[in-house]
Amino acid sequence: MKCLMKILGFMLLATISSFTPAHHSHGNYEMTEYVHLEGIVRQLHMVNPHAWIYLEVMQDSGDEEMWALEAGSVRALTRNGINEDTISVGETVSVRCHQLRDGARGCLLGFLTGTDGVERLWD
């Protein structure tokens, strides 16, 4: 009987833990420093598990680069007062973000300042 109770307890624990929300780390981003970017919002995706902004950034050379900015979840952004109307495609914004460790044009978005001049937390 003790053995059966242990097995049932283990099965219950395994079942419950499978419903526990999981999340990946930010280990692929350089979390100790911010990159400052200014550019034009080309795409905005307010989707879960993370919102995404695609930002067209003009380099000193005149070349344009597309950056992918990973933001927080839609629920977290909503708690911070951010929604689909906070910024618009075509709007020029400045951001502070944590770049990917491999140097690729991707960031974990920290702060975004829109044309209204208000800096908002996007993580």
List where the protein language model places each region.
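OB-fold/S1-family single-stranded nucleic acid-binding modules
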Residues: 100-123
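Short boundary/loop segments of OB/S1/cold-shock single-stranded nucleic-acid-binding domains
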Residues: 20-35
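Short aromatic-glycine-enriched beta-strand elements
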Residues: 47-58
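Short nucleic-acid-contacting surface segments enriched for D/E, G, S/T with interspersed K/R
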Residues: 79-94
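Conserved hydrophobic positions within beta-strands
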Residues: 39-41
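Short, structured beta-strand/loop micro-motifs enriched in basic residues and often containing a Trp
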Residues: 71-79
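Sec-dependent signal peptide recognition
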Residues: 2-10
